[in-house]
């Protein structure tokens, strides 16, 4: 609870975004990502459809930089008013249409704890990262470019953002090297709605494992001759999420966990 993040288009100020948590007596109290329907509805005095503005909060805490996750937080009495119930349907419908990585609240808490204790240090031509392994995504400012998975350790890939790139780590320890954005020379992860539990990749291919809470979706930076397999069958890519980038291919599986192989014939 707490934090009361309530940024909206009517009040698009960073001062309306609460912290991830607060230290008290040697402990870290983790706040809810955003406030609940009470604030959006003037302490449940109306308008009872006010919680639909949580969508504005989700959008404004994701761009131009990701500050908070999508956390749908409300009391069950929200469904006691038709307008409140309609607002819930609208918020859930919006969330289901987004490319999100679902996690339990307990997993989010672990990520916030890792955020507060993560260590970053310059080491040689890269950056040393040490944490608990709960937090797996780091935002690199534009000046650093993008992670180079093939020249790093503990880095699975990266994705673009409006204010930099996001590096995907495979665990709590990594050495990350960055350079101006370019197509990876070896297979790399662009995004996924699940957690990486295993990653072993070379220029000729390799394998990785994803563990999620729903049907798996993931995108890969892939050289054109590479094939992707799971459950002893070749996976057919879905329509590209970025039509102008032929090296990016998107895949879907009905499983919540899968070990995926990539094979790249010699060129």
Where are the model-predicted features located?
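Short, glycine-/Ser/Thr-/acidic-enriched flexible segments
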Residues: 13, 77-79, 134, 215
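Extended hydrophobic/Leu-rich segments
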Residues: 6, 14-17, 51, 81, ...
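Catalytic grooves of carbohydrate-active enzymes
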Residues: 34-110
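Non-catalytic C-terminal accessory domains or segments of carbohydrate-active enzymes
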Residues: 94, 99-267
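C-terminal regions of proteins
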Residues: 20-53, 86, 106-126, 130-143
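Catalytic domains of cell-wall/extracellular-matrix polysaccharide-remodeling enzymes
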Residues: 1-30, 84-85, 258-259, 265
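Hydrophobic beta-strand segments of well-ordered beta-sheets in folded domains
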Residues: 6, 68-72, 206-208
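Active-site proximal loops enriched in glycine and acidic residues that flank catalytic Cys/His/Asp
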Residues: 3, 8-12, 73-76, 104-107, ...
